[in-house]
């Protein structure tokens, strides 16, 4: 099997792309590194395609290894034929390989095996030959042997039938046909063990659906209902058609003596041996597909959660709500440092609302708190009421956000949290985590087991190893997509960086604590156990602000520094210009469209294009000296200018792409590929850009809405909290997420909600119905 050619066909990419990617993987390169820094080799395959390629590569290599093991085993038994070898070599799945190996596989003791030990195989072959003319009992009498346990002709015939049944069951072609027919015509049936019992599985109490049509989330629901002993689930196959097919294959001659025997043997082979195995195989395959689908959805939801836009530059009050033990508070400054913690008791049974408000007002004034980050757990509803009342009483603007606190309690009780906050109790750690989730979701959520974050479906029922690996890959891709500040990143964040293990991550933090801030990327090579290969893999994802080299603050890889510097020289850009641009980009809230009032370089005209970018505005300021003319050119081409002296030269800054006439030629001159050149240009044009800025910011609230206030037709704005196969759950600010069924998401037909929405999206919804008793809210995203 040409694995690379097969991968190219499956993924619909060029074989050369597969060849290059497989080589890079085999050389020990990580997926994030290949996706970001080996685009020329792979043809710019993204991390999702690369992950799929890697997964299939591992499967197909394991398949080839298993084929060789099977072939060796059959050859050792001296039973290999050219036809069998070809079938094994051509097999595309493990199931087919195992079906072909079944007749030759060493078996545990079976009825057929026992019959063979009793010497009944010749009788079985005699019956299969279908040429007996006399009484079968007379033929069978010759095999009576009390020492071997064959006490009668009937016992001999029964043993022979067991041997034939196993032969029928072991035939790979028969199994292939039966499996295919069952997939096409079989049904999944379920019934309640107790019809009168109320449960969440009521829709499955008398349920049936074709195997070929049943969707993943129903399979997972049926599996859970069966595991909880609420449902009985089975697969109903077209048994009549299957037995008829087997009879045609096995009964090849008209023989009134052997035909009835073979008919009953075929029925036994199917019902006792084949049907249970095929049902198990198909249900396992359905479950595997359902799990893969659910894991994929979980992964996409997790990615959206991790890539939420950070709320920076704000002092945040984290609020972990509770009843009896009180609400834990933590004030966190703009850098994530915890300034203060306390506990208030505004909820039952204490109900000390006035005291709680007094404490809150004092903290808000003392620490200039801008935002309250409220966890959505127990007592969240009651806490929100207090917050809303408080906001109305304040003399300064304060808003609040309800944050999904899933996993916060897991983190707060972890060894990591204990190391980070040794003097805090569990509740205080949780409050600090809830505040930080708002400031930098990615940095905070990486500290929590992804499975505990709660944006999936049936995650606790799945293959935990597969789920864990898939979610870890999502976190790894997200962290590397954003990059980390080498001087502030925690070990929890660093360990997800390409090429960095948990041990090396801790070593980086220890090196930083002992030697102070990193001033350049090369210093990473001084970290214990971080060698040249790890450095190659990680360096481009590590950022150093205000370091020796401004390129260290970009995603330009050190291996491309020489090319980047040559490019800057050709475009008349200095390192100081880049530094100035980075500083300007880092100033949050500054209007980058503001015209720089300084003068242009003497004797030159300064043309700043695309002044809405921080780069354009900053470099305009950075290059200004006395004399010359400043021309601010907006995206629409209109310009305004201010003379400062005569000039005969012109420096064009802003859209660097437009200044390059022949990119291919320039890339060759710089000794890099065109794609790498494009990436370097983007980094220079938009320094310090965070890809999370493209995501929607969370909804900041200052008032409260009650579920009883909801009326059909009411239009609201909400945040998508979870995406599942049959719809999306939207937080509309009433402490009970509403469900938008997949049929209500958009006017056009979609197979899955992810085609239209993602976790974290801000969406407009309309109330369809409200069920106060069951606490269910039905919403629609359709217009009108």
Q: Where are the model-predicted features located?
A:
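Duplex nucleic acid-engaging cores and interfaces of nucleic-acid transaction enzymes
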Residues: 49-51, 63-318, 322-424, 431
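Accessory alpha-helical DNA-binding modules that contact the DNA backbone or grooves
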Residues: 30-31, 46-147, 481-603, 618, ...
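Short beta-alpha connecting loops at secondary-structure transitions
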Residues: 18, 341-348, 371, 413-426, ...
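A glycine-rich phosphate-binding loop feature that marks nucleotide/adenosyl-phosphate handling sites
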Residues: 180-188, 319-323, 378-379, 403-410, ...
